[in-house]
């Protein structure tokens, strides 16, 4: 738990530098920035959040469920797989979707591992090993490096609105999924 809490507190730029050093320079998942390196780095970034939300969801399952299943003769693994995990599933899925929303808005990790300002169209098979244009990076780029910042302000606002809409949509999906799964589990 201490390690997960520590990882959750690490700034995203540190994850980006780690992704650059480990996935690109050490392992060499691709020759340069790539979607795969960015995805692996973002997966590490959101892992603590998913673990913590899953842990909390499992803890929230009433102890009486476990005791009832064990009392009726179910084994430990059978109880975990058929009683505890299905009851915790709404919380686990909610944590996963909210974590994806966080990953969608992160700029620092993808600056080092995946993003380019403008990308040329690439073949589908080469998608994972090539750099990609990314919305958060383009927003940052337009705000800091464009020559006519005032003239393209509407583009910046549109991109920010799109990013916020994506994150809100992911959160809404998490809420709907949680409600539907909870309703199914209750019967």
Pin down the residues of each PLM region.
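Interhelical loop and adjacent transmembrane-helix boundary motif
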Residues: 110-164
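Cytoplasmic-entry segments and transmembrane alpha-helices of multi-pass inner-membrane transporters
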Residues: 1-19, 52-53, 186-187
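Short coil/turn motifs that cap or connect alpha-helices
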Residues: 64, 75-76
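C-terminal transmembrane helix and the adjacent membrane-cytosol boundary/short C-terminal tail
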Residues: 55-59, 63, 70, 97, ...
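Loop-to-helix entry region at the N-terminal start of transmembrane alpha-helices
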Residues: 24-49
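Transmembrane alpha-helices
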Residues: 53-54, 76-114
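Alpha-helical membrane-interface segments at transmembrane helix boundaries
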Residues: 1-8, 24, 28, 154-157
């Amino acid at each position: 738990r201490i390690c997960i809490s520590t990882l959750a507190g690490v700034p995203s730029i540190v994850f980006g530098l780690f992704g650059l050093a480990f996935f690109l320079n050490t392992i060499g998942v691709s020759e340069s920035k790539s979607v795969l390196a960015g995805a692996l780095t973002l997966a590490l970034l959101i892992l603590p959040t998913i673990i913590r939300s899953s842990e909390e969801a499992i803890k929230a399952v009433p102890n009486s469920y476990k005791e009832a299943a064990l009392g009726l003769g179910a084994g430990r693994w059978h109880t975990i797989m058929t009683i505890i995990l299905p009851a915790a599933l709404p919380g686990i899925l909610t944590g996963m979707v909210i974590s994806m929303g966080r990953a969608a808005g992160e700029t620092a990790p993808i600056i080092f591992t995946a993003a380019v300002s403008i990308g040329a169209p690439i073949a589908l098979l080469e998608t994972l090993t090539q750099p990609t244009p990314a919305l958060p990076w383009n927003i940052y780029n337009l705000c800091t490096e464009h020559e006519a910042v005032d003239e393209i302000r509407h583009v910046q606002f549109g991109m920010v609105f799109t990013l916020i809409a994506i994150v809100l949509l992911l959160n809404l999906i998490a809420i709907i999924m949680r409600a539907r799964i909870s309703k199914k589990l209750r019967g």
